[in-house]
């Protein structure tokens, strides 16, 4: 009996460690990916208010950062499933220096930038925050005015 219990517990530990945060720790309706949990919020907020909203969940939460095409595809499917309205969605990328130097709010590396054709353009010298675009299936990005009201995608470590 003792040996069976030990083997069972060991298998459970291995199973949970293989799954990591991808299934065990995210709240309901959040997407587990890469050790983080992601949620799209239907509240319309400007970029700064959206970032502050994400940070209020717990320390270390931010607007989402994306680092691969696989991330973009996964988030595209998730946003399409959970976004109740139409519209572009804020992510955590912006150009704070206004010199085409794009930075993530979580300070992760900027290694993936699937811009829409002719973007970014800083149109009218007003567009410094980044949204994922609905008419591209949320697979491409556009810079927009940080004051525009959008749904947004948060990422948290749980």
UniProtKB/Swiss-Prot annotation:
Homodimer; disulfide-linked. GO terms for cellular component: extracellular region. The lineage of its organism: Eukaryota, Metazoa, Chordata, Craniata, Vertebrata. InterPro entries: C-type_lectin-like, C-type_lectin-like/link_sf, C-type_lectin/snaclec_domain, C-type_lectin_CS, CTDL_fold. Residues 33-155 form the C-type lectin domain. Gene3D superfamilies: Mannose-Binding Protein A, subunit A (3.10.100.10). Ca(2+) binds at residues 119, 121, 127, 142-143. The keyword Zinc-finger does not apply. Keywords: Calcium, Disulfide bond, Glycoprotein, Hemagglutinin, Lectin, Metal-binding, Secreted, Signal. Galactose-binding lectin that binds to and agglutinates erythrocytes in a calcium-dependent manner. A motif (Galactose-binding) lies at residues 119-121. Belongs to the true venom lectin family. It is found in: Secreted. GO terms for molecular function: carbohydrate binding; metal ion binding. Glycans are attached at residue 134. Disulfide bonds join 26-37, 54-154, 129-146. It comes from the Eukaryota. It holds the Pfam family Lectin_C. This is C-type lectin galactose-binding isoform. Residues 1-23 form the signal peptide. It comes from Pseudechis porphyriacus. Expressed by the venom gland. The keyword Metal-binding applies.
């Amino acid at each position: 009996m003792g040996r069976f219990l030990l083997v069972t517990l060991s298998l459970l530990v291995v199973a949970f460690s293989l799954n990591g945060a991808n299934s065990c720790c995210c709240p309901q309706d959040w997407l587990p990916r890469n050790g983080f949990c992601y949620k799209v919020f239907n509240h319309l907020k400007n970029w700064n208010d959206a970032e502050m909203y994400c940070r209020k969940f717990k320390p270390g939460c931010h607007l989402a950062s994306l680092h691969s095409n696989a991330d973009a595809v996964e988030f595209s499917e998730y946003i399409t499933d959970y976004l109740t309205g139409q519209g572009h969605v804020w992510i955590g990328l912006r150009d704070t220096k206004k010199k085409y130097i794009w930075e993530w709010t979580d300070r992760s590396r900027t290694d993936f930038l699937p811009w829409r054709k002719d973007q970014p353009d800083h149109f009218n010298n007003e567009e410094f925050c980044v949204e994922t675009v609905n008419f591209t299936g949320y697979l491409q990005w556009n810079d927009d005015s940080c004051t525009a009201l959008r749904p947004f995608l948060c990422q948290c470590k749980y």
